[in-house]
Amino acid sequence: MSRIELTNVTKRWGQFYAVDNLSMVIEDNAFVTLLGPSGCGKTTTLRMIAGLETPTSGRITIDGVPVFDSQRGINVSANKRKVGFLFQNYALWPNMTVYQNISFGLSNIKEEMPKISFEAKNAARLAQILKNPQDVVKTLEECRDKNGKLDETKAIIKLIDTYTISQYTAQKLFGYHLEQGKDVSAEVKALEEKVEAARKAQPFNENFELLKDGEVETAVRKLTKEEIDLSVRRVSRIVKISMFMDRYPAELSGGQQQRVAIARTLAPEPSVLFMDEPLSNLDAKLRLEMRYELQRLHVETGSTFVYVTHDQMEAMTLATQICLMNNGVLQQYAAPLEVYNHPANLFAADFVGNPSINFVEAKGWQGPEGSIELTLLDGHKAVFTPEQPLQLPQWFHRRDEELEAQAQALKARAGESGYVEKSNKDETFRYHIARVNDEDDGIHEEPMLTNEDLVLGIRPEVLSITGGGNVECEIYGAMPTGMESTVKVCIGEYLLTGVVFGSTLFTIGSKHLLDITGSSVMLFDRSSGRRITSGTLKLL
């Protein structure tokens, strides 16, 4: 379908930068979620790609075609970008049936498209179906009520779905009354003759597109009733709402209304489908069901999906790529598990994961064998072993070079014509350290930091309190959910959150020995917030 590329895209209002110098590529057939806290710029980014918001500067291309370029003065209107938009509010017409809601946009399409011999196409399809009357009879027999009477409405819907035809063709097919055992060989012959007569009048190809001098003839035209109906039936089958075509939105549940909105968006066959928190109005159970539906929809349509959400669970379960933003700046663009297991910085580690990651401040220095000796949690000793060979002095040297390059790039940008200083300044993420006597982290001034100041990121699932460890902890709180329990443990004044799988019950105040398992403990640079590496942590 479509590949989307954003190059140095910026959107600002005055000095406030909603999106700041964003560059990213959304590959064809990708499912990308724009994730981040409220006000981070994700909806603004979506609206700029769709053409509903004009960027301040930058370049956007869809399928290699520029739709916005500030330097060349290009700004293609939203209705010409061939994209679909699904909103949080379903925006269904209350006075229209489901069928009318889906077909409304199709009836307004007027563009250049091939001329088609619809009479020949429908006649050929009918002849093909009538050559096997026993199959039609079998389909019709399934539509009898308990009294043995044939239900015409049900029969027509069944014929539409079985043979992928429009309601108009289905009505003609039903009119032959094959259930009465009629011989339709003469009708088949007449239909085939009709097709040949149309071909002689003006030749057409296998798709019944009219030919002129061997080329497909085109014209600026609207869609016919037949084409509209086929599109409506196609998308209704995809989202499974064929049985609701004659109902009004008020007669549908929230999930059914959402399916109608999705069908309406898919009907014009957009090259890209944009979704702005479409599931936020649904209850938790229905939201989970619709996630599965969106996954299936992405596979069946083969379209490029761009999905905005602040719910990291939705992003993790739906996306092939996550675009994580904060304060208008791209923090990380990677696959969901990559963001979870190898977050780029403290913000990414904190935002993705439920329960949230544990942050532990530490002082550390690297020994000659490569491991890092740490002092943490008010004097406890630990050893961190990197998953790959690491030389901390070299890492800090590269960090300083990159930060200097960023500063020079920002300085050069500030010297450009039209540059406006950013009021919402970018700052290193202020992580939260959970304590028994919790207090606002903002009231403490940040101390002078050195390269020995580090932060450990410990996911709840790697905390173990069921085996042998070296550090005593106390159960501060426990929330069993059946298959697992979320616990808070206290070490001195510090609190750590863990997830223990199984049906073990924990008593508040009970003592346990804490251990850290696995090799996914993260080591961050405290001054820049960047992740240095991952590895194992041994508490001594």
Label for each model-derived stretch:
Residues 35-37:
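The feature captures the beta-strand-to-loop junction immediately N-terminal to the Walker
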Residues 100-104, 108, 206-207, 215-347:
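ABC ATPase nucleotide-binding domains
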Residues 58-70, 119-124, 128-131:
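Conserved ABC transporter NBD signature motif
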Residues 67-84, 108-115, 127, 138-149, ...:
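ABC ATPase NBD coupling module
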Residues 304, 309-422:
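Internal alpha/beta loop-helix hairpins
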Residues 368-540:
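Non-catalytic connector elements of ABC transporters
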Residues 50:
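Helix-to-loop junction immediately C-terminal to a conserved catalytic motif
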